[in-house]
Structure formats: C-alpha cells, structure tokens
C-alpha cells in the first residue's frame, strides 16, 4: 500500500481551511499535514511537513500570487501545486505562474479530489471543467 499524499492547505480563511480539511480527511489516500494562513509561512511549512502537494488560495495574504508561486517553485520544485480561487478568470494567470492545476472554488468536492489525484500522478491538469 502506498503512503498517503501529504497535503498542506494554504488559505487565509479558517472556514475554507476547515472545509478542505474535512473533505480531505475523508479520503484514504490523502493526509493533511499542515495549514497556513499567510504566504510567509508556506515554504517553511511545506519543508517541515514534507508535503507532496499544496492547495493554494490564489488570494493568500502576504505576497503577490505569481511571486509566491515562483518562490515555491524555486524552493520546493517537486511539490505539486493546485491553485484554488472563486474567480475563474484567475485560471490562466495561475497556470502561467507555474501552478500544476487550477480549481474554481465553486466546483464539487468530487472534482477537487479528482484533480488532486491527477496532480499526484504527475499529470498536469490544466483544464477548468467549466471551460471547453
């Protein structure tokens, strides 16, 4: 049996972090190993928790979005990165900045779990369900 994917949740809102943790705690192949509410804490948390994947709110306080992704890619290039946003227009910018995937926060939990699975298999999933 494979080890579960170790996930860090990065969102400035406690309610969103709680919802994501609740969802991921139900998945047998995923383990939430950390949470952050500000960009300045993210790289250290990824490294101390040995994270495989980050769920990153596009509006995470503390650093401009593209600069944060660039810093993550420089410090933790092997870590998968899924950007979450309630604004579908952020998709292109997130993917161009280096995210492995983008998920609109209005998508279903099943969809988010499928994107996590794709990302963990190192298949870049760059299509937003709503855009064909």
Place the predicted regions along the sequence by residue.
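Conserved acidic segment of CheY-like receiver
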Residues: 3-16, 20-24, 54
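Acidic, metal-coordinating helix/loop segments flanking the phosphotransfer/catalytic sites
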Residues: 35-53
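Conserved phosphotransfer cores of two-component systems
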Residues: 47-49, 71-78, 97
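Conserved phosphotransfer microenvironments
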Residues: 55-72
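Alpha4 helix (beta4-alpha4-beta5 surface) of REC/receiver domains from two-component response regulators
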Residues: 67, 87-103, 114
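Hydrophobic/aromatic residues positioned on beta-strands within the core alpha/beta folds
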Residues: 82-84
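C-terminal output helix
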Residues: 107-120
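The C-terminal output helix
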Residues: 117-132
């Amino acid at each position: 049996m494979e080890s579960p994917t170790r996930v860090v949740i990065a969102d400035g809102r406690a309610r969103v972090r709680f919802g994501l943790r609740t969802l991921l705690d139900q998945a047998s192949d995923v383990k939430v190993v950390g949470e952050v509410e500000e960009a300045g804490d993210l790289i250290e948390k990824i490294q101390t928790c040995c994270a495989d994947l980050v769920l990153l709110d596009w509006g995470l306080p503390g650093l401009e979005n593209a600069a944060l992704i660039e810093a993550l890619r420089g410090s933790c290039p092997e870590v998968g990165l899924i950007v979450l946003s309630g604004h579908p227009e952020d998709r292109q910018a997130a993917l161009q900045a280096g995210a492995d995937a983008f998920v609109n926060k209005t998508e279903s939990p099943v969809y988010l779990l499928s994107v996590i699975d794709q990302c963990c298999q190192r298949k870049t999933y760059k299509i937003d369900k709503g855009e064909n």
